[in-house]
Structures are given as structure tokens and as C-alpha cells.
């Protein structure tokens, strides 16, 4: 049995796995990208890690930092040291390909994986990847996407479109895609949204439902995790830019599933680096 924590800019995600079977998967919203003070960010992260350690006892916990911790490695080191955790900060390449492998573990498919976090958007094919500064917190800083008005949504969509590479068969990974699909379905159910296909009209419908409602009202719908209401509009901007070209298939997986499988099998491997 192994416990893996994906420590992201928007959220920390706990995955408890045994022999390839998911026993527990929980999302904890943290919003670290919007917290500039390191002590405050450490306190928020520590509260979540404390909850996780209480919930997962007598199981080794492996933590993996992504974009926010590539920017702030000292914060990651403080957390790991404080809680005596095993962990590492993933490079952009590692994060991209581990995420890709959660969808296509054998590198056989002709797909483009879009992994949207708070700090970046990873675009990954089986033989190529790029990291774009299009995370939800980044877009929130660049544009006024605040509820209820959502004043600069169209501008945000155009900005994303201008930076996207060409792609085919898109797969959307990350809490924002899951949240949009959940809003469309009316409830948060990871099994139900796995493989859900979002088209542009679905994303438009979610935006229209959000428009005119406050953060508190959206949170009160109890459809998406508390805190996600602050980033879902930015997520819709990315999703709409993608679905204008092709519908996107939603995946609830992520790099945590790949590294958990590898840890159970004996250790982390990087097959894309063998020729390097």
C-alpha cells in the first residue's frame, strides 16, 4: 500500500492505492499560488498535510511538488522537513510525462494531454511537451475573471488561444476540467466524469450559469470543492479555447496515479529519458 500526495498550486490531492486499486482519493483546496507570504503558505499547507497524516496512518507518504514548488523550493523543503516526508519536486518534464502516462502508460496513443494547474498548463504528446504560463491563478492575475461579472472572459480565451500549439484528440487532466464536467452534470462524482466529453457549448453553458452569481452563491451549490469557485472561470477560459477546435475528453487521473503504480512496482522509472 502506498500514499501519494500531488502538491499543486490550487490543491493537494491524496491518493491511497493498494495493488493498483484506488482505495481513497481526496482533494484539498489550498490556493498557494495566491498566497505570497511564505509563512502563511506554510501554515495553509501544514494544516492540510496534518489532516492527511491523521487520515493515512502507518502508510508511507510520498509527496510530489509541481509548479508552485518549482518557484518556491524552500517552502517545499520546509514542509517535507517539518512532517518527515519522502518527496521531491518534479521537473516540468517529469510532471508532463508522468501525467501523460496516467492516460497512455505505453505511449501508444495519438492524443494531446492538457494538464491544467494553478501555475501552468502542460501540453503533452507521447514524444513532445511544452509548459505554458496559463495556470488558473496566472490567468486570474492577468484578467478580471471574478464573479459575478466575469468582465474579461473573452480576452482571457483569446490569450489562451494565441499560445496553444496545434493539437488533435485532446484529453483534459486536472481539477478544472473535472469541475467543469461536474458543473455540467450537477454533482461531483469522479467516476461519472471520467471519460466525459466536453464540447464548447458545454463550457459556454457553465460560464452562463456562473455569470451573475457570487463566489458565495457558487460555493453554496455544493457541486465543486470549496475554493474551486475562485478558479473555475479561468479553467473555463482554457477549456473553451481548446474545445473551439475539438471536444476534450476529461480524465480524473494525473501523475499521482503513475508514480503510485511505479512505487508499488519497486521504484520510479522515467522511460522517456532512457535514450538521454
Residue spans for each PLM region:
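Short glycine-aspartate micro-motif
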Residues: 2-6, 111-115, 170
